[in-house]
Design a protein with these regions (language model features):
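N-terminal pre-P-loop "Q-motif" helix
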Residues: 345-361
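Conserved helicase motor core of P-loop NTPases
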Residues: 478-623, 633-637, 744, 757-760
Length: 762
């Protein structure tokens, strides 16, 4: 009998048989299943209350990659957890117990667990090899070619599927102390390949390369069985983790050797209280020398890179220098310019004309300027001039985000502008393997807007896919926040001194949105002499609680007048007090979209979504991009009992989401300023509170203000606003892209004169 009085938190070696599936997600292999057992250790509260004739206990198990077949017994290790659905076993490790009888082998092989083997093939295999079947699969799989219907291609599928299953089980066993999920084990397998178990046995610190395995976590567990504090493997793991931490958190492509040694020592010695036992700087320096010698770290001057990041920067600099070295045929633009003036009915300023000319005189050019300085007009002129010069030519418009690309298409009057990921064939991910085939962009002219959002990795992918004879025009505002990813590509290109740059600095917007453009210019210059009026408003509020309350009132009023889709709250923080975006989202939703019925809402963990909610996609998919905004239009229940959520992201992008897909959706009445990069809204509301001062720099405020097309409302304490305006962001990202471009240009013996980085036209 199971002991109902005993406290149950975990169980190991629990033998069960699969009974039924409650839920299964094909995308991530997460499943909720009912299993049966006669194990007396099962807690009473976990057992099904129904009576079964076989007198076996039924309970619910949840986990990843759980076999859903009655052909094998399972041995489960896990923890008992209480959820809103009841007491469940959260499976941490499992293994199949395959019966050695002919019937057992037949059931196992024919269960579909091994790709390439169906019921008929399973019969033939067991009939041929009998009790030696599993030994054949383990050690001599090529003998399966004797079986009719198993080709070389099918054998490869069988080997890969069986090997992956076996490696994952071994990996789960090896990494048991880390309490990883099978999904994480799969991630490790995909990163290191079939040899992952051997690799991690030899050097467990390689786990630090996997997201979620920080050095401290890995080190704490490794030292329980291997307390060699001064081992080269431990020091190497700390070095690589320190470089990656600097890249992901601070945007640095490298660390100076002195800083790397210092930060690595802090990491290594944090758990060592006795000074005499601590790792010395000389030991880290010696390990670094060996890592450099073997290519595990790249040294450039006194700067140290991970090989992958060094390759991104160096490869990009080389491609840019090659593009600049290719003497581009300058085109006679004057007649085309005259045609543009007539067709568009516009008069271009000297700077704007110079920007158009430069685009057709060089293979790579940059146009910069703050809002209201006429960048869109210049883009229209370049497109029209290109059509005039090349009636059969092809051009492509791109931007880093879906919203920015759609805005680019709307403002220029072009049918289509695409995200960089889509145009470059990068799919929805953020990494591309070295062996992957490169797809070149088929265009004679490529224009990219919002290029300041492009990080080092994406810049490399972009230039790799643009032909050397394609003219490239990069457009952006270098005074905005740098890219979310590592590097400072746009700034480095501008200040390399090698790329022709036209700066548009005359504000043309003189009417209803004039104050926004002028005040953005003043903020960028560090001036607090801002003009206030109907389109640029400051609402004084001394405390964060009061600020949050006033923002809610203002939002409701503005949304009623302009529509929810045209009003956006932009906060410096996602989670920090009442004026952070998460807290504002919950408060505002209760006012503009309160609870109506259980049928019109769905709960995912601690989050709730309702019909009519304003939402944001937070991960790229084939249909929608990270940062896209939309509305929930309906919530239904399918035949399996799953709640399905209907979304409308505009145009033909009407999609249905499963509960798992909602993990990549947030409420979006309020968002962070970083998330709004590349977007524009009619009205923007910005909290300015003391609690956010750690983030309030000039470029953050400037970025928030320039998201507004018609109205900016600042709510908070004016001294905090002035502090932000005066506070230049002094944090510099470590990158040598500009210097590397100059060195490559020199190496290619560029014949033309080096153009000044900030070319003043006119």
């Amino acid at each position: 009998m199971h002991d109902s009085e005993q406290e149950h938190s975990s169980i190991t070696g629990c033998r069960v048989t699969y009974e039924s599936t409650i839920f299964y997600n094909e995308a991530n292999k997460f499943s909720i299943i009912v299993v049966k057992t006669n194990d007396p250790r099962i807690p009473l509260q976990a057992c099904s209350g129904r009576y079964y004739g076989d007198r076996m206990l039924r309970f619910t198990a949840v986990g990843y990659e759980l076999p859903r077949t009655k052909a094998v017994e399972l041995e489960l290790d896990g923890e008992w957890v209480e959820s809103k659905y009841g007491y469940q076993l959260q499976v941490e490790q499992w293994q199949e117990i395959v019966p050695q009888t002919a019937d057992g082998l037949l059931a196992y092989l024919g269960s579909g667990l091994i790709k390439g083997i169906g019921p008929k093939t399973a019969e033939d295999i067991v009939a041929t090899f009998g009790p030696d079947t599993l030994n054949i699969l383990d050690n001599e799989p090529e003998k399966l070619l004797q079986i009719r219907g198993i080709t070389e291609g099918k054998l490869k599928d069988i080997e890969e599927s069986y090997a992956e299953s076996r490696v994952l089980r071994n990996l789960m066993s090896l990494l048991g102390p880390f309490k990883i999920t099978p999904a994480t084990a799969l991630k490790i397998y995909q990163n290191f390949g079939p040899a992952c178990v051997d690799i991690l046995k030899k050097c467990p610190y390689d786990l630090c390369q996997i997201s979620g395995f920080g050095f401290k976590r890995v080190d704490g567990i490794v030292r329980k069985t291997d307390n060699r504090l001064h081992s080269a493997e431990r020091i190497k793991g700390a070095v690589l983790y320190t470089l990656e931490d600097a890249r992901s958190k601070s945007g640095h492509l490298f660390l100076p050797s002195e800083d790397l040694v210092k930060e690595t020592l802090l990491l290594l010695n944090a758990p060592i209280p006795i000074p005499e036992q601590r790792v010395r700087a000389e030991e880290v320096q010696e390990t670094l020398r060996q890592m450099i010698l073997h290519g595990a770290v790249v040294a450039y001057k006194q700067y140290l890179y991970s090989p992958r990041v060094f390759g991104q920067e160096d490869d990009t600099a080389r491609m840019i220098a090659e593009r600049l070295a290719n003497i581009s045929v300058a085109e006679n633009i004057e007649s085309a310019l005259e045609a543009v003036r007539e067709s568009l009915g516009i008069t271009l300023s000297q700077k704007q004309e110079q920007a158009v000319r430069t685009a057709f005189q060089h293979g790579l050019t940059i146009i910069t300027g703050s809002p209201g300085t006429g960048k869109t007009t210049v883009l229209k002129a370049i497109i029209e001039a290109f059509k005039n010069l090349h009636p059969k030519g092809k051009f492509a418009l791109m931007a880093p985000t879906g919203r920015a690309s759609r805005r680019m298409a709307e403002s220029t009057g072009v049918d289509e502008a695409r995200t960089l990921h889509s145009a470059l064939g990068l799919g929805t991910g953020e990494e591309v393997g070295d062996g992957e085939r490169v797809r070149f962009v088929d265009a004679d002219l490529v224009i990219v807007d919002e290029f300041s959002m492009v990080d080092m990795w994406l810049a490399q992918q972009f230039f790799k896919r643009i032909g050397q004879h394609t003219r490239v025009v990069l457009v952006g505002d270098p005074n905005q926040l740098p890219s979310v990813g590592a590097g400072n590509v746009f700034y480095e290109l501008i200040h390399s001194g090698m790329v022709p740059v036209t700066v548009l600095d005359w504000i043309f917007r003189q009417s209803k949105d004039g104050l926004i453009a002028y005040n953005a210019k003043f903020i960028n210059e560090g001036s607090t002499k801002l003009y206030y009026g109907n389109d640029f408003v400051f609402v004084d509020s001394p405390t964060q609680i009061e600020t949050a309350r006033r923002i809610q009132d203002i939002y409701c009023k503005e949304a009623a007048e302009r529509g929810i889709e045209n009003v956006q709250i932009l906060s410096p923080f996602r989670e920090k007090g009442e004026a952070a975006s998460e807290q504002l989202n919950r408060a505002i939703r209760e006012r503009v979209n309160p609870f109506r019925s259980a049928e019109e809402e769905v709960k995912i963990g601690s989050r709730t979504f309702r019909v009519h909610d304003r939402v944001m996609q937070t991960k790229n998919t084939e249909k929608v991009s990270n940062g896209d905004l939309g509305f929930i239009t309906g919530i239904t229940t399918n035949s399996k009992g799953e709640r399905l959520v209907q979304m409308d992201f505009g145009g033909d992008r009407k999609l249905t989401y499963t509960p798992e897909q909602l993990a990549h959706v947030d409420l979006a009445y309020a968002t962070t300023i970083h998330k709004a990069m590349g977007s524009e809204f009619e009205t923007v509301i910005i909290p300015i509170v003391k609690a956010h001062t750690i983030m309030l720099y000039r470029n953050l405020l400037y970025t928030a203000v320039t998201r507004a097309k018609k109205k900016v409302i600042l709510v908070g304490h004016k001294p905090i606003l002035f502090m932000a305006v005066h506070r230049a962001d002094i944090s510099k990202r470590n990158t040598m892209l500009g210097e590397r471009i100059r060195l490559y240009c020199k190496a290619y013996h560029t014949e033309r004169n080096a153009l000044p980085g900030l070319q003043q036209a006119g």
